From Swiss-Prot:
Gene3D superfamilies registered for this protein in UniProt: 3.30.230.10
GO biological process: translation
Protein source organism: Rhodococcus opacus (strain B4)
Similarity comment: family membership: Belongs to the universal ribosomal protein uS9 family.
Pfam families according to UniProt: Ribosomal_S9
Keyword terms, alphabetized: Ribonucleoprotein, Ribosomal protein
One Gene Ontology cellular component annotation held by this UniProt entry: small ribosomal subunit
Annotated protein name in UniProt: Small ribosomal subunit protein uS9
One function term, GO molecular function aspect: RNA binding
Disulfide topology: none
């Protein structure tokens, strides 16, 4: 094998073997996956509740075109922060139904962050009632877990929940 001509022949034979391998046809699978899901038909509006911190949100989900009405206002008016808008739409994007449902929500209590988290939970719960087979995807993304974190109460004898006044040894 020390002869350079023999090495060249071996490389050419090996290259021919690898080139002749046929690639699997994946185009059909891509087209099937890219096809939009069939429209959902439900006999009545789905109503769910979501909570986070002090916020409570009641959601009414109906088949539609992806419109949001939050206390009578659009999502852009109610949540001007794009981060909150993405947080709210995340469950719909996860199950690839962002344009399939209209959402009417009544929000009260808490602030923008708590209301956005509560709305996300309520939407995820409503999507499960419509299509139970979406549950594993929503569960693995963490949309069905109620975030139990809340503000810790202030204790007497302390400045805040845990902050004590300065201690002097002498």
């Amino acid at each position: 094998m020390s002869n350079p001509e023999e090495i060249t022949e071996v490389v050419e034979v090996a290259a021919d073997e690898y080139v002749s391998v046929e690639e699997p046809e994946v185009a059909e699978d891509i087209e099937a996956a890219a096809a939009p899901q069939a429209p959902i038909v439900i006999d009545r509006p789905i109503q769910t509740v979501g909570r986070r911190k002090e916020a409570v949100v009641r959601v009414r989900l109906t088949p539609g075109s992806g419109d949001f009405k939050l206390n009578g206002r659009t999502i852009e008016d109610y949540f001007p922060n794009k981060v909150h808008q993405q947080l709210i739409k995340a469950p719909l994007v996860t199950v690839e139904r962002a344009e399939s449902f209209d959402i009417v929500a009544l929000l009260h209590g808490g602030g923008p962050s708590g209301q956005a988290g509560a709305l996300r939970l309520a939407i995820a719960r409503a999507l499960i009632e419509v299509t139970p087979e979406d549950r594993p995807a929503l569960k693995s993304a963490g949309f069905l877990t109620r975030d139990a974190r809340a503000v810790e109460r202030k204790k007497y004898g302390l400045k805040k929940a845990r902050k004590a006044s300065q201690y002097s040894k002498r």
